[in-house]
């Protein structure tokens, strides 16, 4: 089920080397989110910094905020650890390290727990329907009401979200048929 070709060589190398979920997730998020030391507005107009953090030391990210690389590394580690802890607390089926990384990227890190808990993905996964859950990840491809599949090649498109969902699905379904 997992389409390895959708994942980067760096992520695949980590998985094949037996890397931990935090290592896999760090590489994946570096590729998907980037790491900005200066605050910027995300696609929804929310001020973010580092790998998409909206809060730093309990305070919201504001326009003009700048951080050092060391501070971003700290913020990124906190956010990564929170996402993986969420997976450990809320997913009731056994998971491999790549699966934990895929779920952490999708649910708590990207769409947020508030949207994840009522989702078909979450319900299917905890019911043991892994194939169905991996299919449901790929449904989350709208941004501001527009279908991101229709924006491929557009300057201000959101097609990267379609690719990210395919990759999160590949991680979440890593070796489920074996």
Swiss-Prot record:
Organism: Escherichia phage N15
Biological processes, Gene Ontology terms: cell wall macromolecule catabolic process; defense response to bacterium; killing of cells of another organism; peptidoglycan catabolic process
A Pfam family that the UniProt record links to this protein: Phage_lysozyme
Protein family membership: Belongs to the glycosyl hydrolase 24 family.
This protein's record includes keyword Lipid metabolism: no
Alphabetically ordered keywords of this record: Antimicrobial, Bacteriolytic enzyme, Cytolysis, Glycosidase, Host cell inner membrane, Host cell lysis by virus, Host cell membrane, Host membrane, Hydrolase, Membrane, Signal-anchor, Transmembrane, Transmembrane helix, Viral release from host cell
Topology versus the membrane: Single-pass type II membrane protein
Major place of residence: host cell
Active-site positions on this chain: 33 (proton donor/acceptor), 42 (proton donor/acceptor)
Protein encoded by which gene: 54
Entry protein name: SAR-endolysin
Annotated GO CC locations: host cell plasma membrane; membrane
InterPro entries referenced in this protein's UniProt entry, alphabetically: Bacteriophage_GH24 (IPR051018), Endolysin_T4_type (IPR034690), Glyco_hydro_24 (IPR002196), Lysozyme-like_dom_sf (IPR023346), Lysozyme_dom_sf (IPR023347), SAR_endolysin-like (IPR043688)
Enzyme class: hydrolase
Keyword Nucleus: no
Subcellular location(s) of the protein: Host cell inner membrane
Cited function: Signal-arrest-release (SAR) endolysin with lysozyme activity that degrades host peptidoglycans and participates with the pinholin and spanin proteins in the sequential events which lead to programmed host cell lysis releasing the mature viral particles. Once the pinholin has permeabilized the host cell membrane, the SAR-endolysin is released into the periplasm where it breaks down the peptidoglycan layer.
Free-text domain note: The signal-anchor, which may also be an uncleaved signal sequence tethers the SAR-endolysin to the membrane until the latter is depolarized by the holin, resulting in the escape of SAR-endolysin from the membrane.
EC number: 3.2.1.17
Listed transmembrane segments: 1-22
GO molecular function, one term: lysozyme activity
Catalytic activity, reaction form: Hydrolysis of (1->4)-beta-linkages between N-acetylmuramic acid and N-acetyl-D-glucosamine residues in a peptidoglycan and between N-acetyl-D-glucosamine residues in chitodextrins
UniProt superkingdom: Viruses
């Amino acid at each position: 089920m997992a389409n390895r070709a959708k994942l980067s060589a760096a992520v695949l190398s980590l998985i094949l080397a037996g890397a931990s979920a935090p290592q896999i997730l760090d590489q994946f998020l570096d590729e998907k989110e980037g790491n900005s030391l200066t605050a910027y507005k995300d696609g929804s107009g929310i001020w973010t910094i580092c790998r998409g953090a909206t809060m730093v030391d309990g305070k919201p990210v504001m326009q003009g905020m700048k951080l050092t690389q060391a501070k971003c590394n700290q913020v990124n580690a906190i956010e990564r650890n929170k996402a993986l802890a969420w997976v450990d607390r809320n997913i009731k089926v056994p998971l491999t390290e790549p699966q934990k990384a895929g779920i952490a990227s999708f649910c708590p890190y990207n769409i947020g727990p508030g949207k994840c808990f009522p989702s078909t993905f979450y319900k299917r996964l905890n019911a043991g329907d892994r194939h169905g859950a991996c299919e449901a990840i790929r449904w989350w491809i709208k941004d501001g009401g527009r279908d991101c599949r229709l924006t491929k090649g557009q300057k201000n498109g959101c097609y990267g979200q379609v690719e990210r969902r395919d990759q999160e699905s590949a991680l979440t379904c890593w070796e489920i048929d074996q």
